[in-house]
Amino acid sequence: MENKGVVYIDYLNSYVEVTKRKLPKWLSWCVYKLCNYFGFIKKNDNFFTLIAEENDVINEKMLNNLYEKLFEFDIKTVVCAELLLKNERFVKWIREKKIEILDGRWLFRFLPYDIFNKIAYIKNVKKSDLEVSILVNKPTELTNQNVVEFAKECKILNIITDDVLAFRVLEKKMLDEYGIIINVSTNKEKSCVRSDLIFNFDFNQKDLKKCKMNNKAVLVQLDKEKFIRNEGVTITFVKLKIPYKYGEIAKVYRHFNEEILYESFLYYKTSYKNVRKILKRDGVNIRYFIGNNGKIEFNEFRM
């Protein structure tokens, strides 16, 4: 089930897991400390376990051994246990080696249409009554597909960008094929003012601060960069309802975030439509939203 092109990096639950043999605890502890000191790593197919407990040191020898294994098998992408993702030194070291760490953002960018549907449901409003704005300077197939999805259903669709010319073909397609006009503008200050829902694909902090948003607007921060608003709801991630078959795997990969784990199973070079088909096939849907301060309660969207 797991993606063989990705390596999963975990840590030991307890020092007694250092060996499959049943040893006295004192001996297991000695073996563990020795293996930890020399930076040993247990490998089971594409699942690597660092010989380190939850709060133990991941030393230079272990990091070097890990890199050698990743280099040997030409691994460019890894999924890390949640605790390792919180280890700034470990994450920095991985990224310095030009290795990608899956963090859920790839999957998150395929979910704007689901977010749009969920928020309309929570607010108890028609999708055709919502004004949506998309903030993007470097359009991709993914952003363009989202534009098409929104334009067909929302009341007004605004695209705020520094590169208006990049959307000329899409503008013409929407008008010719669907009779839909989309508003493409460079005006960051005024274009978002009446928006109910704003999706930020790649605006940085400086550009975001130029965008005037009303307090009832929901900002969906698809970009990794954290953005703090004085008022209004900001969505930074989602909690998904994962299919049972994947949930059973998550019980085995118990140290891993479920959404990132699910992302890793889908992480291939494929089209927007293919990913959407898989999500529909698996019956994936949004349980709740996550903001800068954790879970966002549904009543916050109605304020």
Could you describe each region identified by the protein language model?
Residues 224-303:
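Adenosine-phosphate binding glycine-rich loop
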Residues 100-117:
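A glycine-rich, Thr/Ser-enriched phosphate-binding loop motif common to dinucleotide/cofactor-binding enzymes
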Residues 122-189:
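Glycine-rich phosphate/diphosphate-binding loop of Rossmann-like nucleotide-binding domains
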